[in-house]
């Protein structure tokens, strides 16, 4: 889960 990097 990478909330900083939403693609």
Swiss-Prot record:
Q: Which cofactor does it need?
A: Mg(2+)
Where is it mostly found?
secreted
Q: Which cellular compartments is it found in?
A: Secreted
The UniProt keywords, alphabetically, are: Cytolysis, Dermonecrotic toxin, Hemolysis, Lipid degradation, Lipid metabolism, Lyase, Magnesium, Metal-binding, Secreted, Toxin
The UniProt entry's GO biological process terms, in alphabetical order, are:
killing of cells of another organism; lipid catabolic process
Reactions catalysed, semicolon-separated, are: an N-(acyl)-sphingosylphosphocholine = an N-(acyl)-sphingosyl-1,3-cyclic phosphate + choline; an N-(acyl)-sphingosylphosphoethanolamine = an N-(acyl)-sphingosyl-1,3-cyclic phosphate + ethanolamine; a 1-acyl-sn-glycero-3-phosphocholine = a 1-acyl-sn-glycero-2,3-cyclic phosphate + choline; a 1-acyl-sn-glycero-3-phosphoethanolamine = a 1-acyl-sn-glycero-2,3-cyclic phosphate + ethanolamine
What is the disulfide pattern of this chain? none
Task: Answer whether the UniProt record assigns the keyword Secreted to this protein.
Answer: yes
| EC number of the protein | 4.6.1.-
Reading the lineage from the top rank, the first entry is Eukaryota
Q: Name one GO molecular function term.
A: toxin activity
Name one cellular component (GO) term: extracellular region
Q: What note does UniProt attach to the cofactor annotation?
A: Binds 1 Mg(2+) ion per subunit.
**Keyword Nucleotidyltransferase on this protein?**
no
Expression by tissue: Expressed by the venom gland.
- Indicate the family of this protein: Belongs to the arthropod phospholipase D family.
Role summary: Dermonecrotic toxins cleave the phosphodiester linkage between the phosphate and headgroup of certain phospholipids (sphingolipid and lysolipid substrates), forming an alcohol (often choline) and a cyclic phosphate. This toxin acts on sphingomyelin (SM). It may also act on ceramide phosphoethanolamine (CPE), lysophosphatidylcholine (LPC) and lysophosphatidylethanolamine (LPE), but not on lysophosphatidylserine (LPS), and lysophosphatidylglycerol (LPG). It acts by transphosphatidylation, releasing exclusively cyclic phosphate products as second products.
Can you name this protein?
Dermonecrotic toxin LgSicTox-LOXN6
Lineage, broadest ranks: Eukaryota, Metazoa, Ecdysozoa, Arthropoda, Chelicerata
